[in-house]
């Protein structure tokens, strides 16, 4: 968008980790860069075989002394097995068998299928990866109704899913397959692992992930649908792995106690 094309521009790229270590880099042949959009500088090809842990990488592109960068997330295709993973009961329903097993001491991961959350607990709230336009009061409750997420990046449930305290593009998939749970109607003592930020006009306490004790058992409730098209959702697979690893650890020790009847209100 300058006054004329750039002649013989020096262009290149680097791929680095969050510590500043350069994993790969390259340069493109000098060329004329036209004014405007929709032209190609070159291709980026970077083997990722050296990346063995889930992490955020930064792709930086330079044109002469000007730079821009983008976050990308890399997850291993082969993960360390979770001991006794089969002891985690993963379900999308709360039938009598599941509830009885939970009360007797089972560990349950309740992943709500998108659209199954009861209206009373947030089923009519439409999450969007992008924020609302202006506010819902001025747009007749036009979707989306929320403003991203808030979480503690150091929470052990997210140890295998690198994140900052706010949403970035690794959360796009989860937020596109989820519902916002109005957890205060279950218990004001719940402290969500991942909180959904509501529109300031309604300001409801909303959760994407939370945990609780029910009887002698422990439950992690996910507003994220971990059922649909999982073969096409690498971010969802990685987040699910992180949650299961947490649930199989001593760190999974919910403080909030809920009754059977309270949990049943979710569906």
What annotation goes with each model-predicted range?
Residues 78-82, 248-256:
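Short, charged low-complexity linker/loop segments at the C-terminal edge of domains
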Residues 1-30, 41-44, 54-63:
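Beta-strand-rich binding/interaction modules
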Residues 235-247:
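Short amphipathic C-terminal alpha-helix that caps PH/PH-like domains
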Residues 43, 49, 116-119, 130, ...:
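Catalytic beta-strand/loop cores that center a nucleophilic Ser/Cys/Thr
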Residues 66, 94, 204-206:
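Residues that act as N-cap/strand-start positions at coil-to-secondary-structure junctions
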Residues 66-77:
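Edge beta-strands of extracellular beta-sandwich domains
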Residues 33-39:
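Solvent-exposed, conformationally flexible loop/turn segments
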Residues 85-135, 213-216, 220-222, 243:
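Short alpha-beta junction capping motif
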């Amino acid at each position: 968008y300058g006054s004329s094309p750039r002649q013989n521009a020096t262009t290149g790229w680097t791929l680095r980790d969050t510590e500043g270590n350069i994993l790969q880099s390259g340069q493109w042949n000098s060329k004329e860069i036209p004014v405007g959009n929709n032209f190609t500088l070159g291709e980026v090809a970077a083997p990722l075989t050296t990346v063995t842990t889930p992490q955020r990488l930064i792709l930086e592109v330079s044109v002469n002394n000007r730079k821009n960068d983008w976050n990308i997330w890399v997850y291993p295709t082969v993960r360390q097995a979770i001991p006794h993973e089969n002891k985690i009961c993963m379900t999308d329903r709360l039938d009598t068998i599941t509830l009885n097993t939970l009360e007797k001491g089972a560990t349950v991961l309740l992943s709500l299928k998108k659209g199954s959350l009861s209206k009373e607990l947030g089923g009519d709230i439409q999450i969007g990866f992008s924020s609302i336009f202006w506010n819902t009061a001025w747009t007749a409750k036009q979707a989306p109704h929320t403003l991203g997420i808030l979480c503690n990046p150091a929470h052990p449930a997210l140890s295998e899913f690198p994140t900052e305290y706010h949403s970035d593009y690794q959360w796009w998939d989860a937020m596109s397959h989820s519902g916002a749970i109005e957890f205060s109607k279950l218990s004001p003592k719940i402290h969500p692992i991942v909180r959904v930020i509501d529109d300031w006009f309604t300001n409801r306490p909303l959760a994407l992930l939370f945990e609780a004790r029910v009887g002698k058992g422990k439950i992690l409730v996910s507003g994220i649908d971990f059922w649909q098209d999982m073969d096409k959702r690498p971010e969802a697979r990685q987040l699910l792995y992180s949650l299961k690893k947490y649930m199989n650890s001593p760190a999974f020790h919910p403080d909030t106690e809920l009754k059977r009847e309270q949990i049943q209100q979710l569906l």
